[in-house]
Curated annotation (Swiss-Prot):
Source organism of the structure: Homo sapiens (Human)
GO annotation, cellular component aspect: extracellular region; extracellular space
Keywords: Chemotaxis, Cytokine, Disulfide bond, Glycoprotein, Heparin-binding, Inflammatory response, Pyrrolidone carboxylic acid, Secreted, Signal
Disulfide-bond pairs as recorded: C34-C59, C35-C75
Cellular compartments annotated: Secreted
GO biological process terms, semicolon-separated: antimicrobial humoral immune response mediated by antimicrobial peptide; cell-cell signaling; cellular response to ethanol; chemokine-mediated signaling pathway; chemotaxis; cytoskeleton organization; eosinophil chemotaxis; inflammatory response
Protein name in UniProt: C-C motif chemokine 7
Glycosylated residues, chain numbering: N29
Residues recorded as bearing Pyrrolidone carboxylic acid in the entry: Q24
Entries under SMART domains matching the protein: SCY
InterPro entries reported in the protein's UniProt record: Chemokine_b/g/d, Chemokine_CC_CS, Chemokine_IL8-like_dom, Interleukin_8-like_sf
Amino acid sequence: MKASAALLCLLLTAAAFSPQGLAQPVGINTSTTCCYRFINKKIPKQRLESYRRTTSSHCPREAVIFKTKLDKEICADPTQKWVQDFMKHLDKKTQTPKL
């Protein structure tokens, strides 16, 4: 039993100091943020500020991450029509010059 506990401690210590253990966690570097769940309902357009797509090979699925005016990030399914419409809306909004 003591040998098993010692082996477990050794393995955990080795894992903690391995290159993978020292890598940044998913979500700290914006280029590797992954979405594991998508919002089920539409977000009011007026609350949205911007969006970005996640296409990292480290992520299980492609996603669109909407950023709200309150600085929240919301994951959405890019295959949903409303998500595509909102992306087009935000694209037009950013292309329109402000006077």
